[in-house]
From Swiss-Prot:
The keyword Signal applies. It comes from the Bacteria. This is Outer membrane protein TP0453. It comes from Treponema pallidum (strain Nichols). Palmitoylated upon expression of a fusion protein with first 46 residues fused to PhoA in E.coli. Keywords: Cell outer membrane, Lipoprotein, Membrane, Palmitate, Signal. The lineage of its organism: Bacteria, Pseudomonadati, Spirochaetota, Spirochaetia, Spirochaetales. Changing residue 249 to E: No longer partitions into detergent, no vesicle association, decreased dimer formation. Residues 270-279 are annotated as: Amphipathic helix 9.
Amino acid sequence: MIRRRYRGCTQGAWIVSVGMLFASCTSGAWKASVDPLGVVGSGADVYLYFPVAGNENLISRIIENHESKADIKKIVDRTTAVYGAFFARSKEFRLFGSGSYPYAFTNLIFSRSDGWASTKTEHGITYYESEHTDVSIPAPHFSCVIFGSSKRERMSKMLSRLVNPDRPQLPPRFEKECTSEGTSQTVALYIKNGGHFITKLLNFPQLNLPLGAMELYLTARRNEYLYTLSLQLGNAKINFPIQFLISRVLNAHIHVEGDRLIIEDGTISAERLASVISSLYSKKGSS
């Protein structure tokens, strides 16, 4: 009887200890409100909003050949939506993920033996650096990731924008998709140099089209994506040739509204879309 009571006490003490450990770990979590786009920052060449549900196959294809594929997948598996920015000059992606993360066990997940170096910001937020990728989980409901070249921004700088957000100015529809809070599965992209992206979509990567900013919205449908694209036209003298070229290559409804070329009901395979998106940050695509 005494032994049973002792065993019960030790088991209870163990449970309480673990609970206290977990509580003490989460007590230091970031509790203030967070602006995802303000954290990734302004001045990017590409912005994206990526709900994970319904788009898992596309995400797997995009990160398939990345050096930090396994580490990125750890984060994605716990993510409901990604807010991202790509910076061509420094060849880096900054990602803010909303979801459910193992905040209390980051030291076990991102261990020194696996090549991670642990550091803290002036606000006491822990982050982990490796050769290609830097990660921080400031709270159980969001994470921050930077991956890219050695010129990429330091994670401490990104985390400083939790306090002082640097929010980019983005189109109304893009903003609307970002605030859908998981109710939409639409992938949204805003690209500063629309000509660079559209030539890859047309499969004419060497063609230099004088085009402005582009908005792209994609919805998964079986193994392909249905998309709507809005492209700012540049030189009025060549607008018609550009419209003609695009209409000959893309199977979609195309028309002009003011200074914008609108492409609706276009389709693209998940494999092709992943290739085009990946080319935006690949060494070849971002040189």
